Amino acid sequence: MSDVVLDVEHLSKTYELGKRHVQALSDVNLQVKRGEFVSVMGPSGSGKTTLLNVLGCLDTPTSGRVLLDDVDVTKMSEKELYRIRRSKVGFVFQTFNLLPYLNARENVELPMECVGKPAAERRRRALELLAKVGLAERAEHRPQRLSAGEQQRVAIARALANEPAIILADEPTGNLDAKSKHEIIKLLADLNLKQGTTIVMVTHDQQIASYTERMVYLNSGRITREKQGTLAGRKKHACPYCGGKIEPGDETCGTCGKPLMPTEEA
Amino acid sequence: MGVLTRAVRNISRRKTRALLVVVALGFSMAIMVSIPAGVTANQLSTQSLTSNLSGLITQTETSLNQTLTEVDCSLSLRFQGFGFSGGQFSAGGFAGGSQAGGFMPPSEFGGGPFGGGGEAAMNASLYTDVNASLPDVAAVVPVLQVSIGHNVTIERFGRNFTRVVADYVIEGVPLVSPLVDDYPILPVNITAGRNLQAGDSGVVLLSENNTGYFGVGVGDNVTILGQTFTVVGVHGASGVSDRLTLYMNLSDAQALTNNTGQITLLKVFADNSADVSSVANEISALHPELTVVTNQQRLSQLQAMQASYGSALQNAESTVSQMQATATQEIVVAVAATSLIIFFLMLYTVRERTREIGTLKAIGFSGWNIMSQFMLEGVLLSLLGGVVGIIIGYATAPMLASLLLPHVNPFNSAAGFRNAAASSLSIQVLVTPTLVLAALAAAAALGALGTLYPAWRASRTRPAEAMRYE
């Protein structure tokens, strides 16, 4: 298995809005390594969501190619694509998109149902995942009885259900209050740090992005620059701000005192 | 938690909507259930009327043919000669099968239609001039007919009607030679024991119906109006006229019914059938107060009537087939309505849940997974509608069928309440396992048909677009 989970080469996507052509993505090149946590930054309309949809096989590019776990997904039929989506990709949405008539556990079980996992096994794994995101007690609650932050945790647990190669999160903190926002980014960073989950997160929130490993800036459908986030420093035991020695679990740098992990006050 | 649970939860999520749709489907299904039942009820009642009528006419014709030389003279005011007149023949039997088979019991003719006698007693001594010495007359047989019955009160349309239902009819005939042997004054079809014979007294010949009524058989004693008689034989009625009639000696009958010297009918037999009308004219001239009817007149009346019933029945049959056509159209409408209700509901549901469909696709549901989810929901809803339809149909079939089907009543010229009663068809939807299965199968099929396109559309939804859908 190659070290690169996601390899995007010369990716372009043009929409036709009536007679107008909208270039949503143009010549995007991006590599995401296994265990990396990348955030894609950019203003509204910069093509972030389009990129994520193409990466997640929800949309097809106009040109270029996307290799997901060494498989070229750009040439696949819809029939092959849903197989890729159910096994290789986990989606987290801005609006959580939980099914309102299913409880938390049942929502987490859904993707496992697609791959034909037995009921008992699905249940066991769903409860395990809910425990992992801190919702063991809320497993039988329906979404409307959960807070926004809790709903997003359920959505993250659902995304992890089939042990995908990559988690694609589209503005996962976009609909959350400050407290929940930090809880979610912390949860994602933890998953990445401790479980090695590969994550690509789209956000327009500079601060949230700064806690990831690598920030990719997208503007008018092009990647304009890249920058390291605090998570990269934590992985290298060096503060990204002052270079002082830190441990991956540290919340602030011992030398310069800057936050390494999101806190409620931050 | 599989696809079925999700379908059930989705349906129960919008309870009011589901309820409304199920009730609407229920009505469509009820139409589908009750219309065939209505058609069948009408067909059955037409069929039973047809067979009753033709049986009756054949029997009557046979018995008339045997006695073509007979001329009946009576003081009857109740009907002019022939039993089948006016309202008498409005045929309660057409009240949708409820009375079919009970078509026109002889009692309704007031004691036997072909006795021609009603029950108006006449003093035999006044008519001694009607005798065998008249030109062309072979024999004169005095007969006493007395109908014994009980009053029955029926309520129709808020009014009470009382009528007498005959239990049996006593017919006294002179058991003397050669009348008994040479003239058809006694039944010919003896099914048990023997016929009455000259000189018999204190004995009776019962009809099969009588044996049931009195609970006796040949050789038994039977008590009639307080007097004991011995049953010597049983006759199988040769026509509707004598179904309830028991025969005994004339003098026995007169004594028994306190009618000494009284008769109700003079049966005059002409020398041959060609003389019948001149004999009738002679008697009419002698006794203008008598109602004189020849069996020949009856036969031609019967034949005319047979023709008119034939055409009435033909009308009924064409109404029934017209009704079948109407029924087919209505069922097609109901089928279309059912499918359309499901179609629009599911189309709306699919639109409403576009984001959900996008989400399901994003997390790995295939088009087929999604299609089967919606198909199952549509079929489940229709099945619920089917169940409700059977219940509604069971409760309202007569009303629905009479609202939706043309009425079949071949004798609608006949006046009277019985005719009105005939229009309230007693249609029943029999909830048999077959009907339940058929209705549910139809519901499932129509549900599937109606859901097919919406579900297919859902399955073809492109996830990226669905996620953007607000």
Per-segment meaning from a language model:
Chain A
Residues 204, 248-251:
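Composition-driven, intrinsically disordered low-complexity tracts enriched in small residues
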Residues 258-266:
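Short Cys/His-rich micro-motifs in 6-15 aa windows
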